[in-house]
């Protein structure tokens, strides 16, 4: 007999009870059929290195988890319980899985990860202020001298070549300018580059005496003291515009994109205008700017109507802010905050509760995905925030009433429904959704119900036939009884008792003075036999 090959997938199937116990500890429910489908058919298509037989490699599991938890239409909420359970097995393996779990290798600092591992929770809103990071003084470097005694440029050094002035043309694709032409705000470059941070602004920090300020500048100081600047590349703008819906179609998604650009790239006033002009139409841009100016607050913290304060905080013309000073940086930070507020307010449509009620759960849509669409409708068509605890009751009722019919009926029958939170309802809806029958099970149920219906119809037909025969037999019996009764009455009618006679009256001629035996009118002779009466039988 040949030996069987043990794979992570077959190992989990052999210990399925332990897998279900681990899933229960994670407050999720998993099914074996979907477990096999996701592992062997779905996750290999994510192109992150997931094999069809499964793996316990934590890095690959993390990449799959990032794909599953992706927001919007690119996510896979129905696969969340399965990848969470798989991750739990990899990070806390049971005894049968320990020999197959890969040890966690230390990651080299030169290979930063594009994403953070913790993605299960909702992303927190980042601040628009540049983060302050301490810097370390680098070790002294040896210089390589050229033939004329001057230092050669190290192409792998921390700094790009210095800006030589207007007499030299900048390299193609990387336009440069001087500080006098375009002042810039210091930018903090994250240790792990974001996929969106493709602007070549330099990714290393300069040493400085003050360790409490950000040292990653979009305007880099070269060897001759001049600053260098890299604006948005045309590829960035093209990708952002073509890979995202328009502001009118999905304002939430485009607002999230612009917010991430404001955080990761920290653009200047000119960059913001270029970004808005590329991603928004003229009418959309005007609406955003108008809402942003409405959000300007005065010294008392309330929205102001003073034109000078509005123009100072959110100018429509290019300001003369000096980004090398704290005042200039504060102006730019406030401008970004107001711009983000304008995007959020301009993205809200007029209040239309009918649009919210029109959001219903699809036949194969998971409750988590349906809840996200419902919350997005609340944000877009109502002035209410679905994340506000005061609106949780309204969102919960909409979730129950607009869920799929089978899920909604079971949610309405829950005990102590008033005390259930929205999270409790979603977990219960997920449990009901995961216990739904598969298409094969549905076909089998329909076939079984059809056979039972045919059997009942056949039994009813047989019962009706028996009842019809029984009724026909009763009618024939009644008819026979009627015929027999009529014949008996005829016979009794011929033999009816004669009327009462007097003592001297003849019974034959009814005359008085003699009896019937002496009646002269009565014929004399032998008496013949009486006629026989024929009876009708059932055979006749």
UniProtKB/Swiss-Prot annotation:
GO BP terms in the entry: viral budding via host ESCRT complex
Superkingdom classification of source: Viruses
Gene Ontology CC terms, in alphabetical order: host cell late endosome membrane; host cell plasma membrane; host multivesicular body; membrane; viral nucleocapsid
Biased composition, class Basic and acidic residues, residue ranges: 437-468, 488-521
Zn finger limits (CCHC-type): 504-521
Residue numbers of Phosphoserine PTMs: 194
Site features described as Cleavage, chain residue numbers: 129-130, 217-218, 480-481
Residues carrying lipid (N-myristoyl glycine): 2
Disulfide bridge partners, by residue number: none
Chain span(s) of sequence motif LYPX(n)L motif: 128-132
Compositionally skewed regions (Polar residues) per UniProt: 134-144
Keyword set, alphabetical order: Capsid protein, Coiled coil, Host cell membrane, Host endosome, Host membrane, Host-virus interaction, Lipoprotein, Membrane, Metal-binding, Myristate, Phosphoprotein, RNA-binding, Viral budding, Viral budding via the host ESCRT complexes, Viral matrix protein, Viral nucleoprotein, Viral release from host cell, Virion, Zinc, Zinc-finger
SUPFAM superfamilies on file: Retroviral matrix proteins, Retrovirus capsid protein, N-terminal core domain, Retrovirus zinc finger-like domains
Disordered: annotated span: 107-222, 437-540
Gene Ontology MF term list: RNA binding; structural constituent of virion; zinc ion binding
Motif (PPXY motif): 160-163
Biased composition, class Pro residues, residue ranges: 159-173
Ranges of compositional bias, category Low complexity: 145-155
Coiled-coil annotated residue ranges, if any: 440-481
SMART domains found in the cross-reference section: ZnF_C2HC (SM00343)
Name under which the protein is recorded: Gag polyprotein
Organism of origin: Hortulanus murine leukemia virus
Phylogenetic classification of the source organism: Viruses, Riboviria, Pararnavirae, Artverviricota, Revtraviricetes
């Amino acid at each position: 007999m040949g030996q069987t090959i043990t794979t992570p997938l077959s190992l989990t199937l052999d210990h399925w009870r332990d897998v279900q116990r681990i899933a229960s500890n994670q407050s999720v429910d998993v099914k074996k059929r979907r477990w096999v489908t996701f592992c062997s058919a779905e996750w290999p298509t994510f192109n992150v290195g997931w094999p069809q037989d499964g793996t316990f490699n934590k890095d690959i599991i993390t990449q799959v988890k990032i794909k599953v938890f992706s927001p919007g239409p690119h996510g896979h909420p129905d696969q969340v319980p399965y990848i969470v359970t798989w991750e739990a097995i990899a990070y806390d393996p049971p005894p049968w899985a320990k020999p197959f779990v890969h040890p966690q290798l230390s990651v080299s600092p030169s290979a930063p990860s594009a994403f953070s591992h913790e993605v299960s929770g909702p992303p927190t809103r980042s601040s628009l202020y540049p983060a302050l990071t301490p810097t370390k003084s680098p070790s002294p470097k040896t210089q390589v001298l050229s033939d004329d005694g001057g230092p050669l440029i190290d192409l792998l050094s921390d700094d790009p070549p210095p800006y030589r002035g207007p007499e030299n043309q900048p390299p193609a694709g990387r336009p440069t300018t001087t500080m006098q032409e375009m002042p810039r705000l210091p930018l903090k470059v994250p240790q792990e580059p974001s996929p969106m941070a493709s602007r070549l602004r330099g990714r290393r920090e300069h040493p400085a005496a003050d360790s409490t300020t950000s040292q990653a500048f979009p305007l880099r100081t070269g060897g001759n003291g001049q600053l260098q600047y890299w604006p948005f590349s045309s590829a960035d703008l093209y990708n952002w515009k073509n890979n995202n819906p328009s502001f009118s179609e999905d304002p939430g998604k485009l607002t999230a994109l612009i917010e991430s650009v404001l955080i990761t790239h920290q653009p200047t006033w000119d960059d913001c205008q270029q970004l808005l002009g590329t991603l928004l139409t003229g009418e959309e841009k005007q609406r955003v700017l108008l809402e942003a100016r409405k959000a300007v607050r005065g010294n008392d913290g309330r929205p102001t109507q003073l034109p000078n304060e509005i123009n100072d905080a959110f100018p429509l013309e290019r300001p003369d802010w000096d980004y090398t000073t704290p005042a200039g940086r504060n102006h730019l930070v406030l401008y970004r905050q107001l711009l983000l507020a304008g995007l959020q307010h301009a993205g809200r449509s007029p209040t239309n509760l009918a649009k919210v009620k029109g959001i219903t759960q699809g036949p194969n849509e998971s409750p988590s995905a349906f809840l996200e669409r419902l919350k997005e409708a609340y944000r877009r068509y109502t002035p209410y925030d679905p994340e506000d605890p005061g609106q949780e009751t309204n969102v919960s009722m909409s979730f129950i009433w607009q869920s799929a019919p089978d899920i909604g009926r079971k949610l309405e029958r829950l005990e102590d429904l008033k005390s259930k939170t929205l999270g409790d309802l979603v977990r219960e809806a997920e449990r009901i959704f995961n216990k739904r029958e598969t298409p094969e099970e549905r076909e089998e149920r329909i076939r079984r119900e059809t056979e039972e219906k045919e059997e009942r119809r056949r039994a009813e037909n047989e019962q009706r036939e028996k009842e019809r025969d029984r009724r026909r037999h009763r009618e024939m019996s009644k008819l026979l009884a009627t015929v027999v009764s009529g014949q008996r009455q005829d016979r009794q009618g011929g033999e009816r008792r004669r009327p009462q006679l007097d003592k001297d009256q003849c019974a034959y001629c009814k005359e008085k003075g003699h009896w019937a035996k002496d009646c002269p009118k009565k014929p004399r002779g032998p008496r013949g036999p009486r006629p026989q009466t024929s009876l009708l039988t059932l055979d006749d």
